[in-house]
Amino acid sequence: MALVELRDIRKIYHVGDQDIAALDGVSLTIDAGEFLCIIGPSGSGKSTLMHLLGCLDTPTSGSLLIDGVDVSNATDDQLSRMRNSKIGFVFQAFNLLPKLDVLHNVELPMVYAGVSAKVRRERAIAAIERVDLGHRMYNTPLQLSGGQCQRVAIARAIVNNPKIVFADEPTGNLDSKTGETILTLFRELAESGCTIVIVTHDNNIASRLPRRIEMRDGRIRVGVEAAKSQTAPLLVSHPTPQKGEEAQP
Amino acid sequence: MNFWFGLIIGLKEIGAHKFRSFLTMLGIILGVASLLSMFALTEGVARGMREMLAASGGVQRVEVNNKEPSEEKQDLAFLSPGRTMDDVAALEKGASLVDLVVPEMNQGMPISRDNKTLRLKAIGTSPGYFELGILELEEGRLLAQNDIDQVNRVVVIGSDIPGELWPENPSYRPIGESIRIMGVPYRIVGILKHYESNAAKRKREAGVSDAQLKRRMARMGKTKKKMRQYDQFWEKNHCIAVPYSTYFNDFRTASNADGSPNRKLDRLSFRVADIALFDETLTQVRSILDRTHRGIDDFGFDTREEWFDNIESSIRATRTSGSLIAGISLLVGGIGITNIMLASITERIREIGVRRAIGARRHDIFVQIVVESGVIGVIGGILGLLAATGVVQVLVLLSPVENAPIITFSAVMISFGFAVGIGVISGLYPAWKASTLDPIEALRYG
């Protein structure tokens, strides 16, 4: 079933007396369990699209359903709830809180979800062990390498069992070898059933994912997606359902 | 968000910038310290005054004093006999709302025994004197109506007199012994209890002996005489009370310039039977005295109530002005907190963005910042209270015993509450600013 459904989304920014359409009529469906990427040059609208999908912002017009909930006109508090319970973020710059140790960084989303301290601790430990950092539990981010930081960020993103994880250039600040291990981690997560959306401008990454959505000038490029998704080597072992309705008619 | 979590974050934030946080708190610390010291000082003064008031007979006691008659009666003023025993008789007979009338004639006189002479105020009065002034007997008996009627030469003395007239044996209770008042021998029939203020009692119990006190006074360049004004019980302990009839016979019969007896009282006090009828009582007494004074309004009332009100209002005034100054200090401290919190959230815009991205609501961010500044207020308040305790200790050493500052629980709570309140209020604007940051902008920041 469709986890995310976008219908004719527009996002218009007012800059001075000019209106700039960052997204200009985007329709898209993402199914549960998909592992896909959004690719495009800077200024193509991919970040804006991710912000909308990630409930950090609301569209100017069009409808946006996430897990069956229409968030296109949601209030700030509703969006916060959505982000907290259904969405996980992984950023290029990791964005861990430098004063908290690994454990507390990972616990943080559950604090805002109102999970009790005991359960929080258990689930955080499980998530940290899942990204192989059980031995770094009480280190602060400053004592960790970039790859380790990103793994902590992933643990934080998945600790609330979100429906979908957004990764914005997750390998952008890492060397290629470390980036590879992070991608492998995402792949493992995808295999275990998590829906993952990677936003990148790196074709190397994009070409290895089961599905790619290419953005250009605020629109999804017609045809590219379907072609790529068929030729791309399937890195994910289980077959990914493809609907191919995302492109604009 | 969990309040405790916010508290922990706040403490960590303060711990991460110890010096900066301390400087921020300094305003609050000074504000609270000055507020509490001021409360303690005025409370000390108030206690001292209330103690003095209670010692002098409380608000029920009213004194009839001399007053300039009003202008149109000034030419007739000679008609009035002034305050005399006639007033006492008239009041005892007619003033139903008064339950005690006490006349007093007094004058400083040499009090001697053998070759030792004291110069003290001898008082000619009635038995009611002891009741009105709340003077209790330690040994012997008080003056009785019989003494008045029979014009006995008897005297009741304060507890410090024996020690000063019999210095060779301070514990001697000289009941039945004779002392001379202006050369006239009087027999001691009673010795009053020793009176001391609570402060003096505390001091004595803390082990400050007279010798120590004398040394201390010598060090401070004060003689015992100078210290008198600080002891409201000095007069009680140096009481020389004789029957007014005897006093009149011995000292007043030819004391006017023309050789006539001086019948005037030096003091006339009465006690209001029911404090609820205070004003009615004064009216009644006024109308009776109008008759005995032949319509000349040459008397007025000195009520302790007025005195009490004056004390209270002057304390209130001191308290208000002190609070204002301390309040300004607290306000400055609050502005300091606001300033630092604003700097702190600018430093942490990205952190706020991250918190928002992982699901913190605006409200959560708001609470976090307010809790942080509240914690500064709480810690500043606690340090301020400690500082005030130190300041008060110093003041206790410096100030006169009766007015030693006192820290009361409510003063502590008020000062502390102010500190916390200022901390929280100063955090409101930064918290609002932080909570309205756009998460996308905040994530991009820096």
Labelled PLM ranges:
Chain A
Residues R212-E225:
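H-loop (His-switch) and adjacent beta-strand-loop-beta switch element
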